């Protein structure tokens, strides 16, 4: 009798869990950018009207468009800075946020999955933007599904602003080495390494990073092996390296990251950024699967780490890969779970987005629909994981 009662209770618990998993998620928050001028103009005044669960909040802000190559698309990304620090969509409280149009990735998942995975690999050392899905309106007119992103800055990266060696660079060409970036691609003349913090007018840290690059170019193998772990956090670098391999992000080898140093006592670390190039698509949205793979030889740091006879970097890389596979973080099951969680959140919103921005619109290489993009990710994992297992000796 007791056994039957136990079984009945267990069945009720399972049914309750199943019912809970089938419940629809809460409606997505909406961000309405209200302004008299076009958001395509730089840093215009606006009001952010934030709606969530029937509650409305309004905050004065300044907004501007953002993005490099993505600016050619009609669906635009934005960044805005409010007068006060607020938490939007459950993200950490701050004044500045990014609204990523996510136009080229029709799954809306590449950035979020990669950022979440990188942080989970090592929460203390691997930083990336926290993200949430929102809908966006411009002056009350629906503009699509967006990814709201935490802005990476001195606060979110944990810098000690009182330390003279705290610094941030966005997409610094430090790994180009002697193949210096063509001046036409330098965004700010006089700021070759794209210093983000401190303000270059207050203190120019380009010389500091130039010295780091010169060390990587000229140090003999013995000196390089002895000193490189004091300059870069190699645990963080290995995780970055492996994530690039796992996702097949060739663009991310030389750019699409923040390089930051918290203070005098911590080495440089990488915070990842921009993973459109992932899970079977390249950075422009063209289908590639594993036809092309990242070229790590062109990255000054990774090339020297992999080929230094005094370092056991390749062994460490394989050991870390094994740990990630054994833990389940680098597995199809893990990514499938992340896909399901994100799909549950946005599935009811993608159709309207693609009514506004058709799947065969400007800039797309094909007319794959949302469901087909998810299938691309799954097929990619079926190909890539066995490749990496063989390459890195995982059994």
Per-range role (PLM):
Residues 87, 101-103, 124-127, 141-242, ...:
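Internal "kinase-insert"/substrate-recognition segments embedded within catalytic cores
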């Amino acid at each position: 009798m007791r056994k039957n009662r136990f079984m009945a209770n267990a069945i009720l618990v399972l049914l309750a869990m199943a019912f809970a998993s089938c419940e629809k998620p809460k409606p997505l928050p909406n961000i309405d950018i209200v302004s008299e001028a076009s958001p395509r103009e730089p840093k215009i005044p606006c009001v952010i009207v934030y709606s969530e669960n029937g509650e409305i909040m309004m905050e004065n802000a300044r907004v501007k468009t953002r993005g490099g190559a993505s600016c050619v698309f009609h669906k635009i990304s934005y960044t805005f800075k409010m007068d006060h620090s607020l938490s939007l969509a459950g993200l950490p409280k701050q004044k500045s946020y990014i609204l990523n149009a996510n136009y080229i990735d029709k799954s809306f998942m590449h950035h979020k999955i990669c950022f979440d995975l990188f942080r989970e690999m090592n929460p203390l050392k691997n930083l990336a933007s926290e993200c949430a899905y929102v809908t966006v309106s411009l002056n009350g007119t629906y503009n699509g599904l967006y990814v709201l992103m935490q802005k990476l800055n001195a606060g979110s990266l944990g810098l000690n602003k009182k330390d003279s060696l705290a610094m941030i660079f966005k997409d610094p060409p430090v790994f180009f080495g002697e193949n210096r970036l063509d001046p036409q691609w330098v965004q700010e003349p006089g700021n070759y390494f794209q210093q983000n913090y401190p303000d270059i007018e207050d203190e120019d840290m380009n010389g500091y990073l130039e010295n780091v690059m010169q060390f990587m170019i000229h140090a003999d193998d013995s000196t390089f092996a002895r000193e490189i772990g004091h300059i870069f956090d190699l645990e963080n670098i290995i995780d970055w390296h492996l994530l690039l391999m796992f996702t097949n992000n060739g663009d991310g080898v030389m750019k699409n990251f923040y390089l930051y140093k918290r203070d005098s006592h911590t080495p440089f670390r990488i915070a990842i950024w921009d993973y459109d190039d992932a899970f079977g698509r390249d950075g422009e949205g063209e289908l590639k699967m594993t036809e092309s793979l990242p070229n790590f030889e062109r990255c000054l740091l990774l090339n020297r780490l992999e080929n230094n006879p005094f370092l056991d970097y390749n062994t460490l890389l394989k050991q870390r890969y094994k740990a990630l596979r054994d833990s389940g973080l680098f597995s199809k099951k893990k990514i499938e779970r992340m896909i399901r969680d994100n799909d549950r959140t946005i599935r009811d919103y993608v159709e309207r987005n693609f009514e506004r921005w058709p799947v065969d619109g400007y800039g797309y290489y094909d007319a794959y629909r949302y469901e087909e993009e998810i299938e691309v990710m799954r097929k990619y994992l079926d190909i890539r994981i066995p490749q990496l297992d063989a390459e890195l000796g995982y059994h």
